[in-house]
């Protein structure tokens, strides 16, 4: 008798699972098919990139995937995060830019398969940490250079209908390597090692702060936003 009921129980189990996870399944499907209607393909449009890089003391709410999340609400908390910053060698500020003291190139590898960032000096890895790359839109592959950096940045986008809407003030340690795509700190989740973003590369706050200071262009003291130049070039970024 029981074996006759097994097919029915299996069908009921599947139906219950689908009903409980309908929103998530539907969301994944429409994004995979490219019919979500969500135009967001990076963390920022070019015109939304901060010109000052200053911390926004007036921000009161942060939203990720349609839900409010907590975040460092004052520049004092932001300053604490910056105090964690050290170069991979543990020394402060003497191996900055696109080469180290030995003249070796400093470059950043972003592995989408491994969901990891590796900071290299020549052929030596000096830092490695998990990241979250694009889930709802792909992270672009190729060889780039950091063209702009901001210490703090508001990011918004996604779809309220599909539950991917985000409004994230005071995102830290932003390194824009291709148009509005950036490697940056993420305070709104701790799921590093899994794709989570609309194309940008999320990193743990402490690692993002370290690599931000390690990479070029170098921001002088008191400067919170800077474009790379011939005299202050951006670090090479290889995404694969």
What are these regions (language model features)?
Residues 2-53, 139, 150, 157-240:
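Exported/periplasmic cell-wall-interacting domains
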